[in-house]
Swiss-Prot record:
SUPFAM superfamilies, per database record: (Trans)glycosidases (SSF51445)
Organism whose genome encodes this protein: Martelella endophytica
Name listed for the protein in its UniProt record: Endoglucanase
Recorded name of the encoding gene: cel5A
First-tier enzyme category under EC: hydrolase
Active site: 158 (proton donor), 270 (nucleophile)
Family stated for the protein in its record: Belongs to the glycosyl hydrolase 5 (cellulase A) family.
Temperature profile: Optimum temperature is 50 degrees Celsius with CMC as substrate. Retains 50% of its activity at temperatures ranging from 30 to 60 degrees Celsius.
Signal peptide bounds: 1-23
Length: 349
């Protein structure tokens, strides 16, 4: 490509967010896309049938569109088939090859363990999946990419049905394991309750993320909080409506205030809408919150793209514009590729 698309109403141009405050030597605002596929299926499914990593052509298409980051979901069980065991060499090679392709295209990668705080369906912190096993996984994975400025560690996708104190203990153990082996990479820390911005201050799991997650401990002080936010009726992103646009934008503004009050930074790791006009308006408003608050936000990653999404998937931006998602891309286009320095993050330490 690239796809030169006419811009919709202008989105505020990005101001450089100091990613260097979180990832040494790298200053840019992350304008990302979730490239889905490696988290699909069940752990035992054959590669290429049950799951897939993004192809080189897909990665190049999104890089040419101006995206400078990819959130890369994958399954813990595939990479570490036995708790506390070695990483599977074949699966690790697939991840490393994908990272290299992203690097070749000038993109930062967020390694996203897409497991909802579970391993084979059992919660982290239970007898069969102790916190130490989660820390062990991150010790092993972080050693592979230690101090690569263009590799960010996303601790876990959307923990849920676990209390904030229990999740905090697991997150702190993983961060400690990462730092103990000498990896200084930026770490993205979610909360519980699906890490929704809308649920950040809610107490239906017990103490809120807002009251608990400020107690993250990182000896390198190189982390940011990851939240997700959708605009449909239940904030899940699974429905085609966008009836909660105002609530979603308000939630992001409230989370921005929490970030500023605690002198920390955030990352909007998932958000997206359908191509209905009112939904696109909400999409722009959510991007505006991040773009207008560069001291609080490192950036965002749209959900989603990837090789295996059906053409009729309502929120998906396809690498081939004929397959759908062009209206969402038009809405994001004004900030893609603007005021970023991808090359500064595209080096291995």
């Amino acid at each position: 490509m690239p796809r030169m698309l006419a811009a919709s109403a202008a989105i505020i141009a990005t101001t450089l967010a100091p990613l260097s405050a979180q990832a040494a030597g790298c200053e840019m605002t992350l304008h990302g896309i979730n490239l889905s596929g490696a988290e699909f299926g069940q752990p035992g499914d054959p590669y290429g049938q049950g799951y897939i990593y993004p192809s080189e052509s897909t990665i190049k298409a999104f890089a040419d569109d101006g995206f400078n980051a990819v959130r890369l979901p994958f399954l813990w069980e595939r990479l570490q088939p036995t708790l506390n065991g070695t990483l599977d060499a074949t699966e690790l090679s697939r991840i490393k090859d994908t990272v290299e392709t992203l690097r070749d295209n000038g993109m930062v990668v967020i390694l996203d363990v897409h497991n909802y705080a579970r391993y084979h369906g059992e919660m982290i912190g239970t007898p069969n999946v102790p916190v130490a096993a989660f820390a062990d996984f991150w010790k092993r994975l972080s050693a592979v990419f230690a101090n690569d400025d263009d590799v960010i560690f996303g601790l876990m996708n959307e923990p849920h049905d676990i209390s904030a104190p229990a999740w905090l203990a697991a997150a702190n153990a993983a961060i400690d394991a990462i730092r103990t082996i000498g990896a200084g990479n930026l770490v993205l820390v979610p909360g519980t309750a699906w890490t929704g911005a809308h649920s950040w201050s809610q107490t239906f799991y017990g103490p809120s993320n807002a009251s608990v997650m400020a107690q993250v401990v990182d000896s390198s002080n190189n982390f940011a909080y990851e939240v997700h936010q959708y605009t449909d009726d239940d904030f899940s992103g699974k429905n085609a409506d966008c009836s909660k646009i105002d609530d979603a934008v308000s939630a992001l503004n409230d989370f921005t205030s929490w970030l500023n009050a605690n002198d920390v930074q955030g990352f909007l790791g998932e958000f997206g809408t359908t191509e209905q006009i009112q939904c696109l308006r909400g999409l722009k408003q959510m991007v505006d919150v991040v773009q207008q608050n560069p001291r609080a936000w490192l950036g965002w990653a749209y959900w989603a793209g990837g090789d295996w999404w059906p053409k009729d998937s309502p929120m998906i931006i396809h690498s081939n514009p004929r397959d759908g998602g062009t209206q969402q891309l038009r809405t994001l286009q004004p900030v893609l590729g603007s005021n970023t320095t991808r090359a500064s993050c595209n080096t291995k330490s």
